[in-house]
Structure formats: C-alpha cells, structure tokens
UniProtKB/Swiss-Prot annotation:
Domain of life: Eukaryota
Active site residues of this protein: 162 (charge relay system), 239 (charge relay system), 549 (charge relay system)
Family statement: Belongs to the peptidase S8 family.
GO cellular component: cytosol; extracellular region
Cited InterPro entries: Peptidase_S8/S53_dom, Peptidase_S8/S53_dom_sf, Peptidase_S8_Ser-AS, Peptidase_S8_subtilisin-rel, Peptidases_S8_3, S8pro/Inhibitor_I9, S8pro/Inhibitor_I9_sf, SBT
Signal peptide per UniProt: 1-21
Residue numbers covered by the propeptide annotation in the UniProt entry: 22-120
Lineage of the species this protein comes from: Eukaryota, Viridiplantae, Streptophyta, Embryophyta, Tracheophyta
GO molecular function: serine-type endopeptidase activity
Glycosylation sites: 195, 223, 254, 389, 641
Protein's UniProt name: Subtilisin-like protease SBT3.13
Species name: Arabidopsis thaliana
EC class: hydrolase
Membrane-spanning residues: none
Matches recorded under PROSITE patterns: SUBTILASE (PS51892), SUBTILASE_SER (PS00138)
Length: 766
C-alpha cells in the first residue's frame, strides 16, 4: 500500500465516497466466514465496461477468475455476482492471497472485502407547499402547480434500494395509473410469498432481491434462524416500504397513527412508478437478541447495476456508512453511485443520524445529493400535571386513557428496594433498568433529539432536561408525589416551527472541505407512511418513523416530479434547482433553528442551501450544471492519477497541468476552508428560464470577508447563448484564524432569486 499507484487509488476512492446507503445509518462490520474459513467475498472493481453486451462483460469476468483459479469449475463456483450493466466488476469467494494476486492484475482498479451494513425513519407535503391535493383520482382538476404540471409524476420511475416492499400496502395501489412507461427495462422477480404476476402492478413495476452477498457472509446457506426474512422482495423490516411510499406512495385517505397525525397520506410523486431493489435483510444481532437490517456491499452493488440497466430516473438510497473515515475500502464501497450519476440518474443519499456534531455528515461525494433532516410544523404535545398542580408539556406518542399514578425517580444506581410498581417513573438515562418492574409509564428526560417512540407498549413521555429537573425537584420535596398524564394531541402550524433535527449529521465535509455537505434539508421527523405489518411500530399498515432515511425519499419524490417536468436536466441541474431555490426560513417565515447541545440559527453546514422548496425548484431561472468533465476536474484536484481516472471513466483521460482548483468545481455553493489573504474562483450558470433575461448580483458577505463578483450583471440574449461564466473574489480582513462565517450570492432578475450559500474560514499562515 506504499507505492504511488496505491496511494492515488486511496485518494481516488476518497473522492468517490458516495451515497449508497440509507439514512438510517449503517455501521461497518466486516463480513465473516464465507464458505470456509479461508475464503470470503471480495468485490473486484474494473471501472467502466469495455463491452456494451452484458454477456461479453460477464464472460470476461469468468475468464479473469478462471485464469486466477486455474479451473473453469472453480471460477463458476466462486462467482457471486457479475456487475455488467452500469459498470464492470464482480463479487467472488476468494482467499486473501487470491484477492491480493488479482488486485495486481493491470485491469483491476481495486479489490475490497464484502462489508455488512446495519440499518438504523401526511403533513410533510403540505408543509413544503405541494398542496392542495384531491382525496381521489376523480378530482384531479383541482390540483395545481408542480403536481398538476407533471400529472403527479406519472411518467417518473423511482428506484429504492432498501429492505424491499410490502406489496399489499394500500399505498402501493395502482388506481388511476396508465400503462407502464415503455422505456422501462426492469422486471418483477418471484420469490417467497411474492407472486410477480399478482403483486406487481402499474405502481410497483419492479421488484428484485439480492441474497448472495449476505448468505455468503453468514456461511453460504440461507439460515432462517440468522436471516429472519422472506427470500423475495417482500419486506419483513418495514424500512423499505416506508421509504418507497414516502417518495412515490399512492393516495390513502383517513390515515392516522393511533389517532395522531390524521389525514391523507401520499408520496411526493403519487403517480410515480416504484422499483424496489431489496439489498437489506433482517439478520439476527450478534448480541442482545432481536434483528437488524443488514446490507452487504456485494448485494448493494448488484442493486445499483440493475437499477442503471432498468431505467430509473432517481435512486433513493437511505443507507449510510456512518461518519466518513479516511479508509480506501470504505470510500470505494460507494463507487457504484458514480456510475449511476454518470448515466443521468440522480442518486439521493442520507446525511446520516450521528449529529449534531461537526464533521459528521456522510455521503460527501460531489455527485451525490445529500439530505439533512428537519422537523415539521407539527408536534404531539402531552400534558403532565404534577400533584402540586404544576403543568408541563412534553412530546410523546401516548394515546391511551389518562394516567394518574404515584411518581418515583430511578437512576442507574437505584437498587431493587425502590418500589415503582404501578407508578410513573422519571429517568434521565434510557439505559436505566425498568424492565420487569411493572411501571405504569416512563418520563424520559433527555437532551433534544426529536425522536419519539412508543417504548414497546409502555407509555413514555420525552421532556427536556430542564423540565425533567423540575419534575425531580417536585419528587424530592414531596412525601407522596403524584402525576397525571393526558394523551398526546396533534398540533400543526405555529408555535411549532421548522428545526434541523438534533440527530441530523452536520458539515463541514471531513473528506473534501471545499465541497459543501449536506446539500439540502427536508422533513425527516415523525413521518407517517406505509410500513410492513411485521414492524413493531406498525398500526393498520402505517407507522411514524424518523431519520435522514425519511428526509431522503422526500427529496427523491420531489426529484421524480422535476424529472417529469424537465426530463433532460442532469443530476447536477436537479441539485442546483433544489439548492438555489430552498427556503432559508420556514415556509411560514420564521427562522430555522438547528437543534443540538445549544440551539442556534441554522447555517449551510446544518441544512446546505436550506429547506427544499418544490414549487420554486421547478422554475429556478438559472442552474449551476455539471457533467463528466466537471467530475474529472474534481478527481484531478483531489489527486487521482490519470490511469485510475481513465479506468473509472472507461476512456483515456489526462489531468491538466497545473491541476484544477477544487474551489472551481461548478457547485451551487462556495466553500473556502482555508482563506489566507484572497482567492478568485469561477462559476458557470445556464439559463433555463426566459431566453432574454438580465440577472444582477446581490452579495451578502460573510463577517470579515469582502466578496466581489465580476461581472455584476449577466445578460442572456438568445437561446444560443444560455451559458455565462463569472468570477468571485474573496478577501479576508481577519488577522487571526477564525471559524467559518456565512453569507450568500444571489443572482436576481426580479422574478427568480438564484441563491447559493457562501462559507469561508480564514487561516493565517505562520
């Protein structure tokens, strides 16, 4: 790993760090024991395909394995997957020495071990302005705006890589849908309790599942004790059903969650078609019992490969690798998404759930659309009345009859002599043992994390530490403390307001600090959508889940509408439209705060461009577009060598000398991580609005920074000249090192305000 080729590959994969995985975050666990103690699954990545014929691609993989193993039969038995559509590569059972040997082959870019990843979930569309909406397909004439202009996304195809789908869900009905788009090349695969003819329809048009990677990881056979799932696309976990129907679920009226959040449930693009790619499985935990959703790299890569072939418009991948590390293996694990984007498919990824610390954001590659999570303007307040008539409010999902009991305090040091049976218990630590104690309810005081749960059937209320301390003070000053708890209600609109969720991962980007991440934010807290009836959080086929896993398909659904309206837009143009038109205040005009250890006003490292605004994104005026040439510039600026880039792209590529600056990558943002004195960078915009337009620059400089734009006016005169370039000079007046300060650059024609965030940190050289 010390030669220059391997070093540049490390950087290569660092840039290719991407989005595969689901916001409900994933921990990396090396796949253990394949078919025997000496072999395990490795992924051999070969870059772009050398043949258009998939059979020839697969044949070349067999030849490479046969040459390595010196046996045609051994090569056939070793091969797990052939990646033949979107890119070239294969997964195979190899010993470590065989993996090392094949990595030295001149056609091989890299060899990585299979990895196992662990899954970590009504009002949203009203909140974002995609309303009013009819209650059935019989009154579509009342639909206006983006939904009307796109026929509710009826020609869009949303691919979802996740834990599968529950095909009987009401949210997957195809009422009112016309024929499947002719460009669709995918299929529905039959399997356990999944009949392709019966369960697929004009809504669920694709259903594939990928078992080979996870089966090889657990010993080579499907073991029902370990993999507690269906050998088909049917969803035992529920996560995949939830994310798919957030993005493209059909209308389902009069839905609630135990009486909360009642209303019409629908996806962002209610008439879009859904293709489910099941690469995540319910696997028994190593410790503690129960199951987790696990997804292996080999299975995920094959899902990407097929999705590229099938013809999806957008890929929603609510999976993530946790906080990025400078690991070549971890970065290469995401390269499949690059090939999807290169072929025009927008890949939407989760920012992660390890927030609110800085540098935690996941899926940081510039070709990914990375989504943070916000709250809705909706809450579920629960009234807590102490025995002294003091009243407090906290959120919960408690919907039962009023609780009136004694009140006690427990902590991790409490002994079994404390009598809590039949009482409501106050705890400050979720690890405090209460199981088997017969408590009536739990009040869990905690720092804000925006996560609500039904706590396995025990009523639980979630006040913050301040209110928890008030309750504790009452307990300690009262001989026989009591409490009354009233069922939660649903409150929408003010005073509830939009916040970046405490769990949502934050920037700056730890891998490439000049690339702003996250890109955008969307609702991801207590989102009501369809779910598998096998999920313990399910009620009548629906559930409330939270996470960047949920905000990711919100954006995917919006992109399905945008691609219906603008089918020729590139993934970069789509991202630009979303980022430059986003709300930087809540839809009601209130400030957007960022939850965390200390609440503050949200900035670009919390929410990127802001809260997604679907209607404005449909008509952005200008876009900051990017293509393969721009991604080559990024790879060159990140230090990739020519041969590595050439293999990834499938054609000979030479980096310019001197290498380009990462500051000049044509992103809809400007991030300068180390400004010493001054720097000049460039951006290019494409007019997608009226042919004859005049835009003027409006500058909001970060504190202590002077921004100068040249020219200050952009004049578009004809359809032949829709692309113009401008420069931005940033000059610091700070005399000491600083943290980041934030501003913005807006191009305005009086109708469109095209806003990009600006983030600058001054670094004084010694």
């Amino acid at each position: 790993m010390n030669n220059s080729l391997q070093s540049s590959k490390l950087v290569l994969l660092l840039a290719i760090a991407l989005v595969l995985f689901l916001n409900t975050e994933l921990d990396f666990l090396t796949a253990a024991g394949a078919l025997d103690s000496d072999s395990k699954v490795y992924i051999v990545y070969l870059g772009e395909r050398e043949h258009d014929d998939p059979e020839l691609v697969t044949a070349s993989h067999h030849q490479m394995l046969e040459s390595l193993l010196q046996s045609k039969e051994d090569a056939q038995n070793s091969l797990i997957y052939s990646y033949q559509h979107g890119f070239s590569g294969f997964a195979a059972l190899l010993t470590s020495s065989q993996a090392k040997k094949i990595s030295e082959h001149p056609e091989v870019i890299h060899v990585i071990p299979n990895r196992i990843r662990k899954l970590k979930t009504t009002r949203a569309w009203d909140h974002l302005g995609l309303s009013p909406i009819p209650t059935s397909f019989s009154s579509l004439s009342s639909v206006k705006g983006l939904l009307h202009d796109t026929n509710l996304g009826s020609e869009a195809i949303i691919g979802v890589i996740d834990s599968g789908i529950w095909p009987e869900s009401k949210a997957v009905n195809d009422q009112g849908l016309g024929p499947i788009p002719k460009r669709w090349r995918g299929k529905c695969e039959p399997g356990e309790q999944f009949n392709a003819t019966i369960h697929c329809n004009n809504k669920l048009i694709g259903a594939r599942y990928y078992l080979n990677g996870v089966v090889a990881a657990i010993g080579g056979k499907f073991n029902r004790t370990i993999i507690q799932d269906f050998q088909s696309t049917r969803d035992a976990n529920g996560h995949g059903t939830h994310t798919a129907t957030i993005a493209g679920g059909s209308f389902v009226p009069n839905v609630s969650y135990f009486g909360l959040a009642q209303g019409l449930v629908r996806g962002g693009a209610p008439r879009a078609r859904i293709a489910s790619y099941k690469a995540c499985w319910n696997v028994m935990r190593d410790e503690g019992g129960g199951t987790d959703g696990r997804c292996t790299s080999a299975d995920m890569w094959k899902a990407f490969d097929d999705a590229i072939h099938d013809g999806v418009d957008v890929l929603s991948v609510s999976i993530g690798g946790g906080i990025p590390e400078d690991s070549e293996v971890d970065k290469l694990d995401y390269i499949a998404a690059f090939h999807a984007v290169a072929k025009g498919i927008t890949v939407v990824a989760a920012a992660g759930n390890e927030g609110p610390g800085a540098h935690t954001v996941d899926n940081v590659a510039p070709w990914l659309l990375t989504v943070a999570a916000t709250t809705l303007d909706r809450s579920f307040p629960t009234k807590i009345t102490l025995g002294n008539n003091q009243t407090l409010f906290a959120e919960s999902l408690f919907t039962g009859p009023e609780i009136s009991t004694g009140l006690a305090f427990l902590d991790s040091d409490s002994d079994d002599t404390v009598d809590v049976k039949g009482k409501t218990v106050l705890v400050f630590d979720s690890a405090t043992p209460i199981a088997g104690k017969g408590v009536a309810a739990v009040i869990l005081a905690q720092k804000p994390d925006d996560l609500l749960s039904r706590c396995n059937g025990v009523p639980c209320i979630f006040p913050d530490y301040e209110f928890g301390t008030e309750i504790l003070k009452y307990i300690r000053t009262t001989r026989s403390p009591t409490v009354r708890i009233t069922a939660a209600t649903t409150l929408t609109g003010q005073p509830a307001t939009t916040k970046v969720a405490a769990f949502s991962c934050r920037g700056p980007n730890s891998v490439s600090p000049a690339i702003l991440k996250p890109d955008i934010a969307a609702p991801g807290v207590s989102i009501l959508a369809a779910i598998s009836p096998l999920n313990p959080e399910e009620q009548n086929g629906f559930g409330l889940l939270s996470g960047t896993s949920m905000s990711t398909p919100v954006v995917s659904g919006i992109i399905a509408l945008l691609k219906s309206l603008h089918p020729k837009w590139s993934p970069a143009a789509v991202r630009s439209a979303l980022v430059t038109t986003a709300w930087r205040t809540s839809p009601s005009g209130e400030p957007i705060f960022a939850e965390g250890s200390n609440k503050k006003l949200a900035d670009p490292f919390d929410y990127g461009g802001g809260l997604v605004n679907p209607e404005k994104a449909a008509k952005p005026g200008l876009v900051y577009d990017m293509g393969i040439v721009d991604y080559i510039k990024y790879m060159c600026s990140a230090g990739y060598n020519d041969s590595s880039i050439s293999r990834v792209l499938g054609k000979k590529t030479n980096c310019p000398i001197p290498k380009p600056s990462m500051l000049d990558i044509n992103l809809p943002s400007i991030t300068i991580p180390n400004l010493e004195k001054e720097v000049t960078l460039t951006r290019t915009v494409t007019n997608v609005g009226p042919i004859k337009s005049v835009y003027r620059a409006v500058i909001e400089s970060p504190l202590g920074i002077t921004l100068t734009v040249n020219p200050t006016t952009l004049v578009f005169k004809s359809a032949a000249k829709r692309v113009l370039t401008f420069s931005v000079k940033a000059k610091t007046s700070h005399k000491v090192n600083t943290g980041y300060f934030f501003g913005s650059l807006t191009w305005s024609d009086g109708v469109h305000d095209v806003i990009i965030p600006v983030s600058v940190k001054t670094t004084i050289s010694m």
